[in-house]
């Protein structure tokens, strides 16, 4: 069911992946409304508190709860949750991790007598907690000061008793469901003088979050290395790599998993997913739900995807600076999908949700990422007789980059050794250019070509290993097309993630190459064997049969363009050399177009034909010169340009094709701090931009975000003159001490996706 036949999954996804609430009781709608109200209320507690109501006194003989102390901050320090804003709100929220104990104190309205007062805790999870499902826990409080059960079970011990006050320590097993738990305290007098006294129940109004625990060896998300935990669980700012294989560009992203709106939004996501409450103990199923719910296809998820203009009715994907503003909007609108996201935005939000829930997670960027729609492990590109690409001949495509996530967990459902990093992808399927929601798929299984293991490993494998085949119209061929080229090294050329413990605001020294974790080195026997192993498993090994070699005595070479700065011209060249002792007649086509990062052609920029009669050992050049005026108005989202070159030798029927792409480089924003950085004290942030164009920039605005300093906000700016150095200043007041990251973006009608960031230290 899982991991096989992705082509069928694509065709049937509208029904196969449609998610509906699992609980169909008549009160489910009311339950969801109540949940939303509570989450919005909890999110708002940073600004106003909600008084706790108490159980009314039912008689002098009954043991009444006067108050409950949850030791929210003390428990948070022990459970590595002290960073969550909800812990420090006006009414602090208890946030715990499974697999370790926590402490509470209860004050009664009279002295507690263990011989007469029967006391128990009821801890429940979900709409209808049940003992049989493990979502309702009954914990009798005895006089024991030690735990009597093993660590796989809930338990409670009496740490201290002082008259009307008792202190309890409660043991949470390492395999309980994650989410919001509620607690009741039930007491009943058992004296012979008053044998019929009714039990009294006190419901704790404060909810308790229980999360996955990467610090606990018994938890399936356990991660041993402390530096890894700091990076993949605790780091709330990182980098997501975009750009191209030759020009990777790290974009600063604020994950913001500790922001006050994020955990409530995560609970809403899990509710909307329809995931069974008991299944929420399993990180495999939780991650699969995240993969489905971060996009809005079929299930009212977080983000709506859009890969081309217009974005006027929402926020353009490149204007987001982090995840928390997206999740906050989703929560405040009670689950209305937020507009708009693209793969790296989906991955950023998925990373935030996973880390917030305690699942170690990282973003992964695959350069030249294949979208194989027919499970052949090939990406077919088709060209007409004139050498122009036929855009709608296939739904296969190669994205200049695609971003997904890896999560860290054990995989008891797979053979030994396939735990560790698991790929999952929350980018939604689109009928023309989207990719599938995916995973979790064992990265080791992908590397080995073991595509039979759950979940969706065939698709992930093809993303990094598919072969690229070029075809051209040919009337003399039985199929109407001739095979120009097979490129086994075009796809999955580089996979990057942020390096542990390294942070670079001015370059990309913090990029880590993890290509070898996903695939063996290109050209090695191991690499080809993994591909052929996967091809045999999929039944399409015939696709890798190479054509018979033809006489090839004319040499062609498309010169790479490393990078150009926006506003500068560029030059494209194909070198041609007749290496034979005979005359050769060559027809060649060279073209340049803007492209979306998904590989879809944006606008054609320039095209040049060449017909040459080459004498023995003669050299020729086909080239095009492109000026700024010819390409600036034709650039699309990420300022990427695709080059195609195709040539045919008449005498030998030798054919040749090549492609290349590059990014037009944009300036960075420069951030300067004016004043002292101290909690509660205003300072000035100055943002500088040098206009690289010889034209006016209008409709200008900045987006700024800095966790612990300010949430995301937008400010407009005046028009910026040609080649002007513009400076915009804003006044900010830090809210929290410690190291803080400030991220800013700039956009105008003529220039978009200009980014800058700065690391600062805020004093208490």
Curated annotation (Swiss-Prot):
- The organism's superkingdom is given as Eukaryota
* Keywords for this protein: Acyltransferase, Calcium, Membrane, Metal-binding, Transferase
Positions annotated as active site in the UniProt record:
343, 402, 425
What cofactor does this protein call for?
Ca(2+)
Task: Identify the enzyme class.
Answer: transferase
Q: In which tissues is it expressed?
A: Mainly expressed in hemocytes, hepatopancreas, and gastric tissues. On the other hand nothing was detected in the heart, intestine and muscle.
Give compartment(s).
Membrane
Pfam families, alphabetized? Transglut_C (PF00927), Transglut_core (PF01841), Transglut_N (PF00868)
Where, in this chain's numbering, is Ca(2+) bound?
465, 467, 522, 527
Stated EC number for the protein is 2.3.2.13
Q: How is the cofactor bound?
A: Binds 1 Ca(2+) ion per subunit.
Q: How does it sit in the membrane?
A: Peripheral membrane protein
PROSITE patterns in UniProt: TRANSGLUTAMINASES
GO CC annotations? Answer: membrane
MF-aspect GO terms: metal ion binding; protein-glutamine gamma-glutamyltransferase activity
Q: Which reactions are catalysed by this chain? A: L-glutaminyl-[protein] + L-lysyl-[protein] = [protein]-L-lysyl-N(6)-5-L-glutamyl-[protein] + NH4(+)
Family membership: Belongs to the transglutaminase superfamily. Transglutaminase family.
Briefly, what is this protein's role? Answer: Catalyzes the cross-linking of proteins and the conjugation of polyamines to proteins.
Q: What is this protein called?
A: Hemocyte protein-glutamine gamma-glutamyltransferase
